Amino acid sequence: VDAGFADCGEESEPLLTAPGSRPQGTEDIWLFLHLLFETIWKFRFFYRDINDLLTRNRLVETHFQRILEHKENTAVTVCEGLAASGTLTATAGEIRALATNMSVVATFWLSFEHARRPRGEPDIGHGVYQVMSLAAPYLQGEARRLLEKLSGEYVNKN
C-alpha cells in the first residue's frame, strides 16, 4: 500500500505543479483536469477506499492530506490567474470556495461514478465538465463561450 501510494503521489505532484507555470486558458484547464482525472483513474483503488485507508495507514493519511492541499492550492492559483487576466470575476473568498469545491468534485467524482454505475466505464469527460461547470458562473466573455463549446463537443460525444 505504501509503495503504491508513493507512486500515486509521485505522479500527481508534477501534474499539480504544472498549471502555475504559465497563464492558463479554458482549454488548458480542461486538458489539465482531464490529465488529473486520468491519474486518479490510474490510482482508483486508493480513491475508492480512501476513508478506510486513511484510518488504517498513517503514511497514506499524511500524504493524501498533502495531495488534497496541493490540489486545492493549484485550483486557487489557476482561478487567481484567470481573475488576473479578466477571464474570471470572483472575490478572494469566492475563489477559495470555488477551489475547494473543484478539489472535492475532482477527488471524488470517480467514486460517485462507480456508485452510479459499478459495472460501467467512468466518464472522465463528464467529470471534467462537472468541475469546469463550477467555474462557469464566474467566467467572462470568450472563456465562457469556449467552456460551453468544449462541454457541448466533449460531453455529448461521450
What are these regions (language model features)?
Residues 1-17, 30-34:
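An amphipathic alpha-helix adjacent to DNA-recognition modules
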Residues 15-20, 47-54, 82-86, 109, ...:
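Secondary-structure edge/capping motif, primarily at the C-terminal ends of alpha-helices
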Residues 22-25, 29, 60, 91-95, ...:
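Residue-level recognition of alpha-helical structural elements
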Residues 27-51, 66-77:
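Helical hydrophobic small-molecule/effector-binding pocket
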Residues 43, 56-57:
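Short loop-to-helix capping motifs
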Residues 48-50, 62-63, 91, 147:
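Short, hydrophobic secondary-structure boundary micro-motifs
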Residues 59-85, 96-111, 126-137:
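Amphipathic alpha-helical packing segments from all-alpha helical-bundle domains
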Residues 111, 115-158:
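C-terminal peripheral helix-coil segments that are non-catalytic and often amphipathic
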